Regions:
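Nucleotide and nucleotide-moiety/phosphate-recognizing core
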Residues: 2-106, 116-120, 124-130, 137-142, ...
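Hydrophobic alpha-helical segments within soluble ligand-binding/sensing domains
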Residues: 111-114
């Protein structure tokens, strides 16, 4: 069984913002696999599906980004998920250009407060991450204003493609393994603007 978590902030005012790449990817998976809404548990929306014969729980924490760890820990404990082999977390990354994707098996939070809280709550940095590039903040901008802002039309197109790739990466991780997904998506591919 896998727990696939998309990070974001709940509420209409945060829809389509840079910080909601995880939510957007979960929405894409829900659509791709026609996942019925499972309800709310542990301050998170979730649904269950099957991918490649594996049970998969798709989850969007309803806490704000910086408090994502509690709902993730509670859901993982409830479904007896091993974070090191059965947890996939999808989130935005300002160190990647819009449209780029990176898959990592473990690592630090890299300044991402949602990941920092998950690491704190789980007590480990060893869990799989899919990072969706949203681009660096412009000089002089506040980081919060940047990640809570919306994309230009040009960047939105690139990010929508990256969200589709992130959803496909989840499928590949589950059906073919993490290394296959990393080989497919961690290549340095120039982003066409």
């Amino acid at each position: 069984m896998y727990l696939v978590v998309g990070l974001g902030n709940p509420g209409k005012q945060y829809e389509a913002t840079r910080h909601n790449m995880g939510f957007d990817t979960i929405d894409s998976l829900v659509e791709d696999y026609n996942v019925p809404q499972g309800g709310v548990k542990f301050n998170a929306m979730y649904g269950k599906t099957m991918i490649g014969g594996e049970k998969v729980i798709l989850m969007k924490p309803l806490s704000f980004m910086n408090l994502s760890g509690g709902p993730v820990r509670e859901m993982a404990n409830y479904f007896k998920i091993d974070p090191e082999s059965e947890l996939i977390v999808i989130y935005d990354d300002i160190d990647l250009e819009p449209g780029q994707l990176r898959i990592r098996k473990q690592g630090s939070a890299g300044g991402h407060n949602g990941i920092k809280d998950i690491i704190r709550q789980l007590g480990t940095e060893k869990f799989l991450r899919i990072k969706v590039g949203v681009g660096a903040k412009p000089k002089g901008w506040d980081l919060a204003d940047h990640v809570l802002g919306r994309f230009s039309t040009e960047d939105r197109k690139l990010v929508d493609e990256a969200i589709a790739k992130a959803a496909k990466a989840v499928d590949i991780i589950i059906t073919q393994g993490t290394d296959a997904a990393m080989n497919e998506y961690n290549r340095k591919v120039p982003v066409q603007k």
